[in-house]
Amino acid sequence: MTPEMLYALRDQAGVPSHPVVFLILGVLTFALHIAAVQVMLGAASLTLRGAFSASQHWRRLAAAMITTAKIAVSVAIVIGVAPLLFVQVVYDPFWYTSNVLSAWWVIGFIVLLILGYIAMYAFYWKNHDIVADGGRGGVWMVLSIALLLAVGFIVHSLTNQMLFPEHWMAWYAPQGVVNPDGHSLHYWHLPRFLFFIALSAPVTGAWLYGYRRYLQGGQEADAAYLGWLRGLAQNLMLVGGVVSVL
């Protein structure tokens, strides 16, 4: 891939404002999107942990977190459109090429997202009263988390691929043989991906603080539950923060 080819792929109309504006908006909207993703991962994990526990505190938390996880997926999808559009505005030739190189995964990303959301709702439908009855159908929540993580990994890989135009030709025509099937993901950076996943722990801890504050504002009478929530939130923020840094 030569600079001349990249120039040829540019939109001749240009961008409607200075690129810095779109870069800043892209970072801000991505931060909101990834925060929703991390809340979703944390809430789904807490739901899975708590629904099958004998502890009433854990079960009560699971009942609240399944609702949080469902809403967080919706928020992540809606807000995620904005940074994607900003990426396309600024880096369109790079993003387009990366998508073409892994076209099957671009379509698969949408399918996996839909299936992951359906699996989460399947768990929700099977558990009308987690506090009283405990959890049922845990395999659905495990499947949901796995599929949503796969969705994140696909986007992570596509984003990394667009950063290395010097490798595009080798990926498209390995050893000089053109391979246009789009079946492969060609590049990823696992530590970077795991870093964003690990951040879900401290972010979820902060979310639990907000949840605890919400209960206090509603005159929650169960002081033991509030104290337990505070301890769990502190542990998630402390341990999760250390793991993320390492």
Predicted features along the sequence, with ranges:
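Hydrophobic cores of alpha-helical transmembrane segments in multi-pass inner/ER membrane proteins
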Residues: 37-47, 107-124, 194-212
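Long, contiguous internal "core" modules enriched in hydrophobic/ aromatic residues
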Residues: 129-246
